Each structure stands twice: as structure tokens, then as C-alpha cells.
């Protein structure tokens, strides 16, 4: 009888132990990723390296930075429009030397895989842009957001110094979240040059440029940002935020995407406020009453902007001094 009781107890204990193991497994599988489960049991790094930054150091040199050291024996990368002469690994960074220079305002694709020192590999495909050493000082100077066929949504940039605009990128939004953009062509400009970009379909005047998608700007609420090049880590040159100050959703911005974009500009110091009330009031703007920068002031705030009088928009020329009352 004692042997039978002991056998039953053993079976119950084994069954109970199995339930505990199964329960723990379910909890782990529901709450942890495969990588975290692997790390939990093996106590080793099983996460692939992550590309955190891309920088073009010169016409033929590209620097890739990862979140952990890379094994130099396992770097397998190619450039589709070029060829890679050599690659050099130093801790978390991989420096690539290309055989031919990257043309200004054009992208080349680098793809392939790298491996960390634990043997975890990752594959990626990225676009890299030439480094423009001669970018002029540029400001967003005038824009409209309630365009029509005759007067489409437009943005005017003004150069306040001489330089080459190749690769400079104007976003409807930010580099993290944009709905349209234009990558400017390889072109030298003088101080005082005005560049006009159409962001919606309609009359295209001689000399005007067109955005990629022609989707228009946010009529009542939105933002523009100007970056040195299209790469994610690019430095911003200028930004502007507008709103009607009456939208009730997403803290007055109308969408979470815009709210996040404005907060990003605020955090980077390119706009003085992350509140909708800190934006330029768009209520009285129209297709011909444009937003105008006041005397090229650049304080990253709504205070440097005004709305011009009806039919007083002056794209391609100095801003009108006639203001909407």
C-alpha cells in the first residue's frame, strides 16, 4: 500500500511539475520576444546588430555605425550603382571606400550583411547621398496651404548666401514623417535667389519646381522642414509650423502624426513651442493670402510670420509688405 501511495504521489508530482513548466513557457512566449527568450535561457547575446547612423564623409567614403561591435571578417556589402574598393571595421563602425564618386543630388544603394562578434548577422539595404560641401544658407520665406488650380500650394525658399542646393530636401512634415518632399537639384545659387516649389497640381510657372507626389500641404494644420540631405541623420536648416488654433483633436494639431512631428522640431530646437497655440495662425490664409516671413527674421517662432493682403502673394520675389488686417 505504501509503495502504491508513493507511486501515485510521484505521478502527481510529475504531472504538477509539467503543468508548472508549461505555464512558465506560455508566460514567456506571451511576454517575451524570441530574442529575449534566447537571451533568458542561454545568457548570450542573440540579437542582430542594428544600423543606427549613415554618414557620407566625402564623395567616395561612407561611414556606417551600428549599435554594437562588428566582426570585420564577416562584412559582405555591395553598391549597386558603384563598386566598393575596401571596407574597414573599427568597433561599431564600418567605413566603406567606393571606386567612383557619388554624384551630387543622386543616391546610390548599398546592401548586404554584417555580423557581430557573437555571430548574429543582419541584412540591410540603404540609400546613401553625396556630401554637399557648399550648401548655402536657406530659409523658408513664403508659402500657401489652401491652393487651387490657378494658385496651387507653393513654398518659397530664399538663399541668404551663395552655394549649391544639391540634395537639400524640403519636407511636407519632417524627415521622420512626411507626406511629400522635394530633393533639390545640382544647382548653384547666389545670395538673394528665390526658389519656388509647387506642392499641389495646378499652374506651374516658368522656373518653378515640383514636389515628388503633388499631394498638397495641410490646409489648416501642418509643418514644413528643410534638411541638408535626405538621409535620416541629416541636419535641419529651417522649419515652420502652422495651425488654425480651433481644431479640437490631438491637442489642437488634428493628428497624432503632426503632434509628434511638431514635438520633434521643438525638441531639436527648430521651433520654439510644441503647443498648437505656438503655431502661425492659419485662419485667415487663402490661396492668394500667403504666409510671409518678416524681413528674413529667423527666431523659430510664429512671431516672425504674417499673412499678406488678398492677391498680394509674391512667389519668386521679395515678400509683400501689405498685410491682411
Model-predicted regions and their roles:
Residues 31-45, 55, 121-176, 216-218, ...:
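A structural motif detector for short, solvent-exposed N-terminal "entry" segments of globular domains
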Residues 216-325:
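Conserved beta-structured recognition patch
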Residues 114-120:
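Short, solvent-exposed loop/turn segments at the edges of extracellular beta-sandwich modules
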Amino acid at each position: 500500500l505504501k509503495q502504491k501511495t508513493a507511486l501515485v504521489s510521484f505521478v502527481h508530482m510529475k504531472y504538477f511539475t509539467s503543468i508548472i513548466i508549461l505555464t512558465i513557457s506560455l508566460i514567456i512566449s506571451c511576454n517575451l520576444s524570441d530574442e529575449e527568450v534566447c537571451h533568458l535561457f542561454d545568457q548570450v547575446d542573440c540579437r542582430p546588430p542594428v544600423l543606427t547612423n549613415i554618414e557620407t564623409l566625402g564623395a567616395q567614403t561612407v561611414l556606417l555605425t551600428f549599435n554594437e561591435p562588428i566582426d570585420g571578417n564577416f562584412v559582405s556589402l555591395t553598391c549597386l550603382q558603384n563598386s566598393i574598393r575596401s571596407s574597414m571595421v573599427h568597433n561599431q563602425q564600418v567605413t566603406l571606400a567606393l571606386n567612383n564618386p557619388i554624384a551630387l543630388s543622386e543616391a546610390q544603394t548599398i546592401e548586404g550583411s554584417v555580423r557581430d562578434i557573437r555571430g548574429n548577422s543582419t541584412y540591410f539595404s540603404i540609400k546613401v547621398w553625396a556630401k554637399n560641401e557648399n550648401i548655402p544658407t536657406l530659409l523658408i520665406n513664403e508659402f500657401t496651404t489652401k491652393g487651387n488650380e490657378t494658385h496651387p500650394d507653393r513654398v518659397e525658399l530664399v538663399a541668404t548666401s551663395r552655394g549649391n542646393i544639391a540634395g537639400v530636401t524640403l519636407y511636407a512634415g519632417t524627415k521622420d514623417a512626411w507626406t511629400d518632399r522635394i530633393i533639390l537639384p545640382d544647382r548653384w545659387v547666389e545670395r538673394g535667389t528665390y526658389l519656388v516649389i509647387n506642392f499641389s497640381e495646378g499652374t506651374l510657372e516658368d522656373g518653378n519646381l515640383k514636389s515628388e507626389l503633388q499631394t498638397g500641404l495641410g490646409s489648416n494644420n501642418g509643418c514644413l522642414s528643410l534638411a541638408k540631405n535626405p538621409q535620416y541623420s541629416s541636419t535641419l536648416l529651417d522649419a515652420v509650423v502652422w495651425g488654425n488654433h480651433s481644431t479640437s483633436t490631438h491637442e489642437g494639431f488634428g493628428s497624432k502624426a503632426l503632434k509628434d512631428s511638431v514635438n520633434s522640431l521643438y525638441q531639436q530646437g527648430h521651433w520654439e513651442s510644441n503647443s498648437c497655440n505656438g503655431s502661425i495662425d492659419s485662419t485667415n490664409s487663402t490661396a492668394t493670402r500667403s504666409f510671409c516671413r518678416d524681413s528674413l527674421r529667423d527666431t523659430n517662432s510664429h512671431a516672425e510670420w504674417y499673412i499678406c493682403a488678398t492677391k498680394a502673394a509674391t512667389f519668386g520675389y521679395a515678400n509683400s509688405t501689405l498685410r491682411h488686417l
